[in-house]
């Protein structure tokens, strides 16, 4: 099993899809990496030689921000928005949709489970 950027890639998958298991690498980026290193998309992860795996590791390390560093960077960007007091930062702080979606009826993913307001008795 190839271990790249701290992630165990699934053995039986093709390398182009296996690399997408790394946070920050999608299919397009995966193909760019394989082109730069000169490895065929059709190759399976278990077929990779140690030299090829090392070449992929080196390419990712030198040119891409992935896994922990990327997560930290995204978290710091969101924290900066909140500290600035920008509209986007306030939406993050309140746990509401950030990109202008309507919230009257939807936005359940961001808002969480419904909180029913009980009827007040006299």
UniProtKB/Swiss-Prot annotation:
SUPFAM superfamilies, sorted: S13-like H2TH domain (SSF46946)
Gene that specifies this protein: rpsM
GO terms, biological process: translation
UniProt cross-references to NCBIfam families, sorted A to Z: uS13_bact (TIGR03631)
Keywords: Ribonucleoprotein, Ribosomal protein, RNA-binding, rRNA-binding, tRNA-binding
GO cellular component: cytosol; small ribosomal subunit
Record-stated family: Belongs to the universal ribosomal protein uS13 family.
UniProt protein name: Small ribosomal subunit protein uS13
Subunit composition and interactions: Part of the 30S ribosomal subunit. Forms a loose heterodimer with protein S19. Forms two bridges to the 50S subunit in the 70S ribosome.
Highest taxon in the source lineage: Bacteria
Biased composition regions of type Basic residues, renumbered to the chain: 98-116
Ranges where the record places region Disordered: 98-122
GO molecular function: rRNA binding; structural constituent of ribosome; tRNA binding
The organism of origin for this protein: Campylobacter fetus subsp. fetus (strain 82-40)
Function: Located at the top of the head of the 30S subunit, it contacts several helices of the 16S rRNA. In the 70S ribosome it contacts the 23S rRNA (bridge B1a) and protein L5 of the 50S subunit (bridge B1b), connecting the 2 subunits; these bridges are implicated in subunit movement. Contacts the tRNAs in the A and P-sites.
One Pfam family recorded for the sequence: Ribosomal_S13
